[in-house]
């Protein structure tokens, strides 16, 4: 007799679009669809595309005769874990303090779990990806801002002494001033926004490389008369472009990777004393440049001045990539 297939509905709320999927107990995506993220709407209007997508997943599961055992949601913000509500979701403020789990459990009669997106990504990697078999994990994602999560034996560590506002962890005393008022925060040194500013400085210095020329050509192709050269480059800069040029040997791109690698190494060194992670999982579009960033981070953790514990941290790339938070949002449901 064939065992009934168990699946869970995963909802990964993103800035441009939200992914909703059916995930099986092995972490495989069995069916998925996308729902538009509607900003600036009342809460029920914001949730409507997600609810419709969940309905579609449940209809598909019924058609396939799959047993649905729960719903997992990852959100890009902070949570009130006691009330199981989003606490602060800056891009979707109508969700703030809304009883999202209660609504979903009432509507679908399924147990529902809510996670911060970076925590969900860590759970995905722990159960099904690059974190399998590791007791003490540090997960670091480099996107527009920097996010981090820590786990011991698969349990996310939520102590404010550890992750907290990770993007505001100071890693350089003389670094750029951050919006929080401090200097040298991680967000000012290794986020995608920080990398964009590095490119802008290269443009102002007049450095002519393939990367800077591509950005200048993109800016000039849309007009921009009367604007300083390169002033519109933020519109075209991306992790994929940076990685592509770094792989081709572009000096500016490779210098950015070197600086980011040193910054990540400094951040990990700060965590070692608090947490002693055994493995660091890196995620984000900048990993598209093969092992370039991984090599830089490993090098920064193995300098003569590095502690023995730092040099023992294993540095690996994410295995689940963009699906990490999606898969991780339902991983505890199967545990």
Tell where the protein language model's regions lie, with residue ranges.
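General beta-strand structural signal in soluble alpha/beta enzymes
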Residues: 112-116, 150
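Active-site glycine-centered loops adjacent to acidic/histidine catalytic or metal-binding residues
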Residues: 117, 143, 329
């Amino acid at each position: 007799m064939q065992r009934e297939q168990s699946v869970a509905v995963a909802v990964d709320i993103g800035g441009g679009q939200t992914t909703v999927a059916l995930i099986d107990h092995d972490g495989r995506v069995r069916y998925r669809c996308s729902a538009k993220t509607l900003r600036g709407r009342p809460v029920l209007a914001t949730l409507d595309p997600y609810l419709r997508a969940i309905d579609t997943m449940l209809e598909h599961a019924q058609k396939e005769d799959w047993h649905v055992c729960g719903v997992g949601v990852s959100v890009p913000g902070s949570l009130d874990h006691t009330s199981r509500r989003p606490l602060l979701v800056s891009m979707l403020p109508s969700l703030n303090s809304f009883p999202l789990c209660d609504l979903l459990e009432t509507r679908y009669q399924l147990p529902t779990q809510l996670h911060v997106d970076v925590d969900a990504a860590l759970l995905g990697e722990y159960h099904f990806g690059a974190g399998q078999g590791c007791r003490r994990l540090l997960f670091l994602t480099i996107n527009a801002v920097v996010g981090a999560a820590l786990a011991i034996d698969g349990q996310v560590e939520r102590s404010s002494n550890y992750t907290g506002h990770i993007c505001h962890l100071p890693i350089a005393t003389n670094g750029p001033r951050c919006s929080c008022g401090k200097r040298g925060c991680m967000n000012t040194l290794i986020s995608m926004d920080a990398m964009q500013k590095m490119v802008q400085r290269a443009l102002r210095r007049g450095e002519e490389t393939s990367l800077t020329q591509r950005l200048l050509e993109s800016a000039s192709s849309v007009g921009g008369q009367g604007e300083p050269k390169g002033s519109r480059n933020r519109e075209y800069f991306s992790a994929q472009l940076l990685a592509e040029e770094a792989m081709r040997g572009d000096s500016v791109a490779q210098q950015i990777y070197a600086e980011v690698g040193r910054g990540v190494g400094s951040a990990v060194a700060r965590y070692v004393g608090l947490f002693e992670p055994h493995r660091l999982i890196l995620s984000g579009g900048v990993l598209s440049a093969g092992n370039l960033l991984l090599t830089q981070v490993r090098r920064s953790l193995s300098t003569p001045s590095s502690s023995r514990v730092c040099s023992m941290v294993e540095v690996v790339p994410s295995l689940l990539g963009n699906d990490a938070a999606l898969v991780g949002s339902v991983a505890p449901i199967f545990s």
